[in-house]
């Protein structure tokens, strides 16, 4: 496996736009914001794309608050039939699916944390599979949820390097540079450990 995603960024911060107390934190705060708002979302979107691309089972249908729980159980059952252990599995769900499953009376009655959901309004787990809410923009088009096992995908970040240069030549302030070398791979013999549900276009 050879990583193909070699990404970099650079930006400057003018020292004159910050007062004395802000200056010491300005470059570090800007770098953290860049990582949080740009780098991490890009890597996550790429990973979800690769996971969906490599899935053995992709189902298209419609999710409503009346069938969200049953739709999810169908996916979990598919993994069980593919000899995928539920231990180590997780589900990434869109905000729409999250809303539908929270309103599905079957889930509220039968979910693993049904009492906590009734009391606290929290989404919990289904058959030991944790539900992780993901912004729809992170998923490929029309994907509602993904159930996968951690053994199915490897996603190395081979190089993650960030530097802040204080007053480099020609700049009165900071030059911030970063480079990330990463990829994501679905293992050929683990494709059956991924279940993707999409809505009809």
For the regions a protein language model found, what residue spans apply to each?
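Sequence/fold signature of self-assembling virion shell proteins
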Residues: 1-7, 22, 104-201
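Residues forming anionic-ligand binding surfaces in small-molecule and nucleic-acid pockets
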Residues: 5-18
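Alpha-helical scaffold segments that mediate packing/assembly in large oligomeric complexes
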Residues: 15-82, 195-201
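Intrinsically disordered or highly flexible coil/loop and linker segments, enriched in small
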Residues: 44-48, 85-88, 185-186
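Extended, solvent-exposed, turn-rich assembly/linker loops in the middle of proteins
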Residues: 53-123
């Amino acid at each position: 496996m050879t990583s193909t995603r070699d990404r970099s960024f650079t930006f400057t911060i003018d020292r004159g736009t910050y007062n004395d107390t802000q200056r010491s934190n300005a470059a570090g705060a800007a770098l953290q914001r860049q990582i949080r708002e740009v780098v991490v979302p890009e890597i996550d979107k790429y990973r979800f794309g690769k996971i969906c691309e490599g899935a053995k089972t992709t189902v298209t249908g419609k999710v409503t608050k009346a069938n969200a729980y049953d739709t999810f159980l169908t996916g979990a059952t598919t993994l069980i039939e593919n000899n995928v252990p539920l231990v180590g599995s997780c589900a990434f769900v869109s905000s729409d699916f999250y809303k539908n499953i929270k309103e599905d009376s079957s889930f509220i009655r039968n979910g693993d944390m049904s009492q906590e959901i009734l009391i606290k309004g929290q989404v919990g787990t289904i058959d030991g599979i944790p539900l992780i809410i993901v912004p729809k923009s992170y998923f490929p088009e029309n994907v509602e949820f993904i159930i996968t096992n951690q053994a199915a995908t490897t996603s190395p970040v081979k190089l993650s390097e960030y530097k802040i240069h204080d007053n480099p030549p020609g700049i009165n302030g900071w030059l911030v540079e970063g480079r990330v070398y990463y990829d994501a791979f679905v293992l050929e013999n683990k494709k059956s450990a991924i279940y993707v549900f999409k809505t009809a276009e």
